[in-house]
Curated annotation (Swiss-Prot):
The keyword Nucleotide-binding is assigned to this record: yes
Gene: alaS
Key words of the record: Aminoacyl-tRNA synthetase, ATP-binding, Cytoplasm, Ligase, Metal-binding, Nucleotide-binding, Protein biosynthesis, RNA-binding, tRNA-binding, Zinc
Protein name, UniProt field: Alanine--tRNA ligase
Family: Belongs to the class-II aminoacyl-tRNA synthetase family.
GO molecular function: alanine-tRNA ligase activity; aminoacyl-tRNA deacylase activity; ATP binding; catalytic activity, acting on a protein; transferase activity; tRNA binding; zinc ion binding
NCBIfam families documented for this protein: alaS
GO cellular component terms given for this protein: cytosol
Described purpose of this protein according to its UniProt entry: Catalyzes the attachment of alanine to tRNA(Ala) in a two-step reaction: alanine is first activated by ATP to form Ala-AMP and then transferred to the acceptor end of tRNA(Ala). Also edits incorrectly charged Ser-tRNA(Ala) and Gly-tRNA(Ala) via its editing domain.
Domain of life: Bacteria
Entry EC no(s): 6.1.1.7
One Pfam family cited in the UniProt record for this chain: DHHA1
InterPro entries linked: aa-tRNA-synth_II/BPL/LPL, Ala-tRNA-lgiase_IIc, Ala-tRNA-ligase_IIc_anticod-bd, Ala-tRNA-synth_IIc_core, Ala-tRNA-synth_IIc_N, Ala-tRNA_ligase, Ala_tRNA_ligase_euk/bac, DHHA1_dom
PANTHER family: ALANINE--TRNA LIGASE, CYTOPLASMIC, ALANYL-TRNA SYNTHETASE
């Protein structure tokens, strides 16, 4: 067999099938597009469903691909076996109703055995088939020439996932020789058995039957081929190494971890597990982030967080106790660059995300592990089970994925009460759900609304005032013919200029009127059958069905909403430009007086980034871009480069809001005709709303001007207060005043020390000998807690062999501090002194053996507490 790099195997595979008339299907992103059934792309065929189910017709019926994939159903095995991975590449050739078994088998055999391609020894190859697949047997035996002893019939060789296409499959195995296992009746030492000798190389699936609802099988009119070859496994064979981890896909990563840790791979079993976990997980994490996923507390983000934290925990067994995973990203990028350039292109961003996540976990890891170790120790002496509440606390407070806790527990032969854990999780979800408020007053669409099929046309893109007719009136959940003044009703217009709340944009408000009545419109939503449903309060008169009316939107509010919505598009584009393409809209609110925009990003924006984004939006406003809005087929919109919002569903015809070249988005909202109409854009806040999501609130036009006017007024007040004439002098004067304050504070603290020292007199006279120890236990008069610590430092420098306990009444609260020379901590501990003394003054405290502090609420007991602690030391 040829000794080939993994990149050469991948390219050979593609080149071979291109020669055989196959089109190359590029590797799709790991985050599925238009497929809600998958968390990740998890196989080579997953991205080709559109061809197999007939939704799309490929340019050619013959397809070849190398598809990156993620599978996380057995994460806990990764690191402990030779070939388990969370990220892998699947090489595959596919036929959509073109060739079938004969060609598929012949192609596979030629690629594996031909000197031009893989040059495998034919005598080392074995195959498995389904017992009833006579055609596959005939092809292997008669056409390929495999003797019967190398064709193994296995009942499990049938691909079936329930209703739909199914069929037998044939698997090709490579015999690695007796070094990897000898014949033993007690072991499954045969192709298809659980062993290390016969490795599966390729799986060919012959999709020729339809699995019917009644569990019968009928032949498919068009038969398909679906094959899969794991690149990592093939690389281990071509490079003649024992496991996938010794291939050129992993070893450069492992070598870098060796440098960081000072440990050597393949010298210690425990170390090897850590090396493999890290090498596997960093590939998954880097590729997932490159394809748009970010660490979070749910969904894909939770998988990433779990993998990263698992890798960090295993890195501790290599004595790596600081963020380092981010340093491996460049290695992954270099290894995979020939076929996957996007990891290198996004390397800086990927590293920032990983480093930020590592730092967050390291902050709580030590404390969390200490708690978990205590829980493990307790469980071993009692129930051999970690309680669900404790597991939930580790998850909720310390960021420990429950699977990580479970894995550690399993290694210690313990279990976790998962039922209670799930109950705690559900309670948290319920609390979150109750905290969310529904912004629509009609939360449940009644049967009455569903029955209304009257046509209603929205004309508000073009006009704000429209003559119309009230076609339906709903009051108290029922259709009515009329309603009176003071009553609240829902109603539908034949034509309406009122925008219904959608896409983050609030509904229009305004009036519906004629000479007999007036309705103040307060809310507009979408009815079940697509009409705009208006809610309003009758100001005067009697409203009747089929009444002719004048519908008028509040012009002032509509103009402000338009400005804010168009500014939101500019903001989205600016964020992508400044922060990176990973930015996606995660929610928005467009109102008359402000806009709010939520977006995916891994950490707080710097002030420089905020300023740059704000300036870019204003520059596009000043550029006076004409806003072109058109409806077109979605395929045309995509060719135009229109940005679709992640997670939104679109029809065949879409509305494109074009502020080219800066912003092109699919949007059903209302916008300005020219960006100059926005006037001014000002960001007023940037904050986090949850893991991986940031929020910007901003103002436009008059609201932005009034905000800046307020800021200017406040600035002028500060300028007046610090008594300077020009704006440029304000900062300089404030810095000068702060420096003065620091110096005065320093002088005051020194004076306080001197006063305290004078009050205390010669402290050596107050030292007592108790139980063979020199002890100074006394009350001090100090202004604050900082001063008591400074007094302690002063006393320690003078009494280096003395146990010192100081107590003070500071504004009605008791402050305690104790120190013990390290040479004496085997006799008495500062932490124990404070733990025993603090309750006497109505408080608590603790600390290290050499230093501890505490507090209390009962200063009247200070004298008693000093007497108590002297007696305590005497009793030791």
């Amino acid at each position: 067999m040829k000794n080939l790099k993994a990149s050469e195997i991948r390219q050979n595979f593609i080149d071979y099938f291109v020669e055989k008339g196959h089109m190359v299907e590029p590797s799709a992103p790991l985050v599925p597009i238009d497929d809600d059934s998958l968390l990740w792309i998890n196989s080579g065929v997953a991205t080709l469903k559109k061809y197999f189910d007939g939704r799309e017709t490929p340019r050619k019926p013959r397809i070849v691909n190398s598809q990156k994939a993620i599978r996380t159903n057995d994460i806990e095995n990764v690191g402990f076996t030779a070939r388990h991975h969370t990220f892998f590449e699947m090489l595959g050739n596919f036929s959509i109703g073109d060739y079938f078994k004969q060609e598929a088998i012949e192609f596979a055999w030629e690629f594996l055995t031909s000197e031009k391609w893989m040059a495998m020894e034919p005598k080392l190859l074995y195959v498995t088939i389904h017992p009833e697949d006579k055609e596959a047997y005939r092809i292997w035996n008669e056409d390929i020439g495999l003797e019967e002893s190398r064709i193994i019939r296995i009942e499990g060789n049938f691909w079936d996932i329930g209703e739909g296409p199914s069929g037998p499959n044939t698997e090709i195995f490579y015999d690695r020789g007796e070094d990897f296992g000898q014949d033993d009746p007690a072991e499954e030492m045969y192709p298809g058995g659980e062993n290390e000798r016969f490795l599966e190389v390729w799986n060919l699936v012959f999709s020729e039957f339809n699995h019917n609802k009644d569990h019968t099988y009928t032949p498919l009119p068009n038969k398909n081929i679906d094959t899969g070859m794991g690149l990592e496994r093939m690389a281990s064979l071509a490079q003649n190494v024992r496991t996938n981890y010794e291939t050129d896909l992993f070893m450069p990563i492992i070598h870098e971890v060796e440098k960081v840790s000072g440990k050597t791979y393949l010298e210690n079993d425990n170390y090897d597990v850590a090396f493999k976990v890290i090498a596997d997980h960093i590939r998954t994490i880097a590729f997932a982030i490159a394809d748009g996923a970010l660490p979070a507390n749910e969904g894909r983000g939770y998988v990433l967080r779990r993998l990263l934290r698992r890798a960090v925990r295993f890195s501790q067994s290599l004595d790596i106790n600081e963020p380092f995973m981010y340093r491996l990203v460049d290695i992954v990028a270099d290894i995979m660059e020939p076929y996957y350039p996007n990891v290198k292109e996004k390397a800086d961003f990927i590293k920032r995300v990983i480093k930020s996540e590592e730092e967050r976990f390291h902050e709580t890891l030590e404390e969390g592990l200490a708690i978990l170790n205590n829980l493990v120790a307790q469980a071993k002496t009692s129930t051999h089970e970690i309680s669900g509440k404790d597991a939930f606390k580790l998850y909720d407070t310390y960021g420990f994925p429950v699977e990580l806790t479970e894995e550690i527990a399993t290694q210690e032969n313990l279990s976790i009460d998962m039922q209670t854990f799930e109950e705690e999780m559900q309670q948290q979800r319920d609390r979150a759900r109750q905290a969310r408020q529904n912004s629509q007053s009609m939360q449940v669409q009644s049967e009455v609304l569903k029955k209304i099929t009257t046509d209603s046309t929205f004309v508000g893109y073009d006009v704000m005032d429209k003559a119309s007719v009230i076609t339906d009136i709903i009051q108290n959940g029922e259709l009515v013919e009329s309603a009176e003044a003071g009553e609240t009703i829902y109603f539908i217009l034949r034509e309406t200029p009122f925008y219904a709340v959608s896409g983050g944009q609030v509904a229009d408000q305004g009036t519906i009127s004629n000479e007999n009545f007036e309705i103040a419109v307060t809310e507009v939503t979408k009815a079940p059958n697509g009409q705009n449903l208006h809610k309003g309060e009758i100001q005067f008169g009697t409203v009747k069905k089929n009444a002719e009316v004048s519908a008028s939107v509040n012009h002032k509010e509509r103009r402000s909403i338009k400005k804010n919505h168009s500014a939101t598009h500019l903001l989205h584009a600016a964020l992508k430009e400044v922060l990176g393409d990973h930015v996606n809209q995660a929610g928005s609110l467009v109102e008359a007086d402000r806009l709010r925009f939520d977006f995916s990003h891994f950490g707080p924006m710097t002030q420089e980034e905020i300023d740059t984004v704000e300036r870019r939006v204003n520059e596009e406003i000043w550029n006076s871009i004409e806003v072109d809005i058109q409806e077109m087929p979605i395929s045309e919109a995509k060719q135009l480069g229109a940005m679709a919002l992640f997670g939104e569903k679109y029809g065949e015809i879409v509305r494109v809001v074009n502020m080219a070249p800066f912003s092109i988005e699919l949007c059903g909202g209302i916008h300005v005709n020219n960006t100059a109409e926005i006037g001014l854009f000002k960001i007023v806040s940037e904050s986090g709303t949850g893991a991986g999501v940031r929020r910007i609130e901003a103002l436009t036009g008059k609201s932005a001007f009034l905000y800046l006017e307020t800021i200017q007024s406040q600035f002028n007040a500060v300028k007046s207060q610090v008594k300077v004439k020009s704006d440029d002098q304000v900062l300089e004067k404030i810095v000068h005043m702060q420096d003065e304050e620091k110096e005065l504070t320093k002088q005051l603290e020194q004076k306080n020390k001197e006063v305290t020292s004078l009050k205390m007199g010669d402290i050596t006279n107050q030292v007592e000998e108790i139980n063979g120890l020199k002890v100074l236990a006394t009350e001090v008069d100090v202004p604050n807690a900082k001063a008591i610590r400074e007094t302690m430092d002063d006393f320690k420098s003078k009494l280096q062999d003395t146990v010192i306990v100081l107590i003070s009444n500071i504004d009605g609260k008791v402050s305690l501090v104790a120190t013990v020379p390290k040479a004496l901590t085997d006799k008495v501990k500062a932490g124990d002194i404070i733990k025993n003394m603090a309750p006497v003054v109505g408080g608590k405290g603790g600390g290290r053996p050499d230093m501890a502090q505490g507090g209390g609420t009962e200063p009247k007991n200070i004298t008693e507490s000093l007497r108590f602690i002297k007696d305590y030391i005497k009793s030791l």
